[in-house]
C-alpha cells in the first residue's frame, strides 16, 4: 500500500481527460510521479492494489485496438476495479441505438469511468458534456478520437522518454532542453498532436519531419499555449517547434526519434508515391541514425509497419528500440490516470447519477 500513500489527488482537478490542452507542467509531473510509483511495483507475485476496489471501468472502443484497450483493462484490474468491455458488433448500435444511449446504458449499470475510442474527433467530449448535462458523475477518458487527440499515449511517451533520460528520477527536469524528432504521417496522427502539446509544454524542442503531403506547414504553429491561471512552471523554458523536410538534417543533434505509422486507412487520396520510396526518404535504420552522432532511442506508438517506418533490425534492437518499453509503460501510466480520475470521485450509484 505504500505505493499509493499520500496520493497527489489534491493537485488533480479534472473529472474528464479529453485532451492535454489544459494540462500544466504540474499536471504532467503528477502523472509521471504516480506512474513511477506504480511502475516500481514488483512484476511477480500479487499484482493488485485495492485502490479502485468497488469501481467499474467500462471500455467503449468503436475502433480496433490491441495495445490501448488491453493496457487500460490491465491497468484497471491491477487497481482492483471491475472491468466491462463493449463490442460494437454485438451491441444494440446494430439495431439503431444512438451512441449516447449506449453510453447511458453502461452508466446505468454503474460505470465510474468510460474509456472511449472513436473514429470521429470530438465524440468523447460530446459524451462528457451530455452526461454532465444529465447530472451524471461518470468520468470520460479519451482513448483516441479521430485525428484529434490520444492523451494517454502522449503521457506514456513522455514517461518513457523521462525514464530513458533519467531512470532513477523520471521527472520533467529529465526532459527539459532535449530535442525530439517526430517523423512520418503527422497529418493523420492524433498521437503526434498530443505529443506536440505535451513535449513543448515540458520544455522539449520538437522537430517535425515528413513530406508536405503528410506534414502541412500549418503544423509549425501547433505548440502548447499555457491555459489562463496556470500554476507556476516547474521547468523554466517551453519547447520550440520547427519543420524539417530532410530527415538526415532533422536527425542532427537529436536526443530521441519517434516515427509514426502511415495511416493509409485514413487517406482519401494517394499521398505517397510508394512504400519503398517513402522508406528510402523517411524510414529509419541503424545507418541513418548515425546522423544523430550518438546512440539515440527510437519510439513508435504502434502498430509498426516493418520496413516502412523503420527497419526490422532497428525495431528488434533492444539497445535502440523503446517500442516494447512504451507498451510496458502504458500500464502504469494508465493506472495513474484511472486512479486520479476514479479515486477522486465518489463511487457512482447504480444509476450512475450523483
Curated annotation (Swiss-Prot):
One of its GO terms (molecular function) is amino acid binding. It comes from the Bacteria. Keywords: Pyrimidine biosynthesis, Transferase. One of its GO terms (cellular component) is cytosol. It is an enzyme of class 2 (transferase). The keyword Transmembrane helix does not apply. GO terms for biological process: 'de novo' pyrimidine nucleobase biosynthetic process; 'de novo' UMP biosynthetic process; amino acid metabolic process. Pathway: Pyrimidine metabolism; UMP biosynthesis via de novo pathway; (S)-dihydroorotate from bicarbonate: step 2/3. InterPro entries: Asp/Orn_carbamoyltranf_P-bd, Asp/Orn_carbamoylTrfase, Asp/Orn_carbamoylTrfase_sf, Asp_carbamoyltransf, Asp_carbamoyltransf_Asp/Orn-bd. Its EC number is 2.1.3.2. L-aspartate binds at residues 95, 190, 261. Carbamoyl phosphate binds at residues 67-68, 117, 150, 153, 302-303. It catalyses: carbamoyl phosphate + L-aspartate = N-carbamoyl-L-aspartate + phosphate + H(+). Belongs to the aspartate/ornithine carbamoyltransferase superfamily. ATCase family. Heterododecamer (2C3:3R2) of six catalytic PyrB chains organized as two trimers (C3), and six regulatory PyrI chains organized as three dimers (R2). HAMAP family: Asp_carb_tr. Catalyzes the condensation of carbamoyl phosphate and aspartate to form carbamoyl aspartate and inorganic phosphate, the committed step in the de novo pyrimidine nucleotide biosynthesis pathway. This is Aspartate carbamoyltransferase catalytic subunit. It comes from Synechococcus sp. (strain RCC307).
